[in-house]
């Protein structure tokens, strides 16, 4: 009987903690889209100053524009 109560209490605590932390995720996703907008207006000097993670993001963005799947979303 105690083990069932403990399991129920554990599940409720996980659900409550998940509910209270979901507000943090949409802001982090918005930052990713802002980064894509920042990559739109690059010139050569900006390209030389990029961090490696920015270059990966730029490469992913270029591949997305070249892919056939992207044309389906237009």
From Swiss-Prot:
This is Anionic peptide clone 7. It comes from Tityus costatus (Brazilian scorpion). The keyword Metal-binding does not apply. Its main location: secreted. May be an antimicrobial peptide. Expressed by the venom gland. The keyword Chloroplast does not apply. It is found in: Secreted. Residues 1-24 form the signal peptide. GO terms for cellular component: extracellular region.
